[in-house]
């Protein structure tokens, strides 16, 4: 099935996690308990008015969910491995290794604020991302580092330079400072 877009301003983490599993598995292979747990752990942050979920998904929630998935896969017949990387552990080589082993990379990057997306392909110069935030086709016309891809709904919808992804800026799709990764 095609990968999905966010239904709110805040559910990029939830949707990107669901997209990661949708990319890796057929619908009938995805356990309902996994989907339920993604919804349980994500959207755990409050906005400045105290509204739960409207602050998105925290790093701590992703850490806990990674642990839950690891435990679940060790106790059940579900073949997936989650490895959580931080700071200087986040390297292009590790991302390529994941992709080359038929995996998906779930990252927290920037898009005006912290934002979650998945990487499904890496080439010599580019990272191919599925961004769950729907944008108009001309959004990146003035940004040479990002290209909208509209004809790959099962795989990706952005092509981003590797240089941009690993820049220590807060430009769209940058991972930002090494120490905040």
Segments and roles (model prediction):
Residues 31-35, 114, 134-136:
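Short Gly/Pro-enriched loop/turn and capping motifs at secondary-structure junctions
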Residues 31-35, 119, 151:
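Generic alpha-helical hydrophobic packing signal
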Residues 65-73, 116, 137-139, 143, ...:
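A generic structural signal for ordered secondary structure
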């Amino acid at each position: 099935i095609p990968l999905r877009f966010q239904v709110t301003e805040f559910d990029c983490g939830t949707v990107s996690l669901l997209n990661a599993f949708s990319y890796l598995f057929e619908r009938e292979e995805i356990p309902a308990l996994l989907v339920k747990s993604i919804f349980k752990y994500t959207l755990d942050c409050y906005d400045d008015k105290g509204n739960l979920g409207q602050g998105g998904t925290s790093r701590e929630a992703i850490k806990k969910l990674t642990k839950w998935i690891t435990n679940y896969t060790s106790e059940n017949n579900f073949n997936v491995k989650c490895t959580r990387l931080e700071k200087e552990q986040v390297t292009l080589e590790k991302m390529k290794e994941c992709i080359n082993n038929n995996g998906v990379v779930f990252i927290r990057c920037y898009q005006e604020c912290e934002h979650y997306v998945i990487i499904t392909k890496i080439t010599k110069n580019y990272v191919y991302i599925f961004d769950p935030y729907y944008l108009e086709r001309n959004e990146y016309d003035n940004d040479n580092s990002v290209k909208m891809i509209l004809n790959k709904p099962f795989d990706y919808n952005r092509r981003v330079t590797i240089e941009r992804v690993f820049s220590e800026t807060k430009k769209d799709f940058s991972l930002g400072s090494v120490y905040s990764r």
